[in-house]
Amino acid sequence: IQPGDYVVALVGSSFAERVVAPRSKVTKLPKELDTRTAVAAWLQGLTAVTLTHAAYQIKRGDYVLVHAAAGGTGLMLVQVAKALGAHVIGTTSTTEKAERAKTLGADHVLLYKDDIVGRVNEVTSGKGVNVVYDSVGKSTLDQSLEVLAQHGSLILFGESSGAPDPLPVHLLRPKNIRFMCFALYGYLNTQEEYEHFSGILLDLLVSDKVHANVWREYLLSAEGVQQAQQELMSRTTTGKLLIRIPPSPDEA
């Protein structure tokens, strides 16, 4: 990396014009990839890549269930899973969000009010799914366990509906279910790990197998950041909300 290169970094406290990032979490962007796409894709993209390549390695032909399939991470998961050859089933709250998930590759999208277990069994001919990616938590965990196939994997990586009730581990025994509580940074401890997974994500983006989904852009200001936070918490958005830094006077 040289001065003047365009880079993307995984760093906190980034509502700022300048940030300090560790070298181990900075990636040089290829010329084919613009900064807007990289920023929109990076955090959720890395989450999706590690979920599908490490937490559970998706194989061609797998049946995959993605809860909250129209959210930022959900849309990335749908696309990465499809790129790996999976049959993707998503869940979401509205028909509008369902259409968005289908546009980006979901084979079937169910609404939370539907009979999720019955529909999944119908789609999978009663076999269940190989893996469930669950970022919802409390309101979906029981369904997630029920729709899994024999030797299936349940990856919990969020709790948007609240923390699940304590899980009696004996419920995992009948189908030999593998259960994981996922944390992204657990797969990015070293520079080698970060470069490995970021390289996979860059390849997916440059090859157009994965597309960043931008909901809206906001200026870096007190009002802009407040509006973005309020819309994010409303759970009415799909995809990413970006904060844009206004150009400096000499750049305007």
Segments predicted by a language model, with ranges:
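Helix-to-beta-strand junctions that scaffold the AdoMet/dcAdoMet cofactor pocket
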Residues: 59, 148-149
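N-terminal Rossmann NAD(P)H-binding glycine-rich loop of SDR-like oxidoreductase domains
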Residues: 70, 74, 78
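NAD(P)H dinucleotide-binding glycine-rich loop of Rossmann-like/cofactor-binding domains
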Residues: 6-70
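C-terminal hydrophobic helical "lid"/dimerization subdomain
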Residues: 192-252
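Short glycine-centered segments of the SAM/dcSAM-binding site in methyltransferase folds
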Residues: 6, 63, 87, 152-153, ...
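Short, glycine/polar-rich helix-capping loops at beta-to-alpha or helix-loop-helix junctions
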Residues: 14-17, 92-100, 164-169
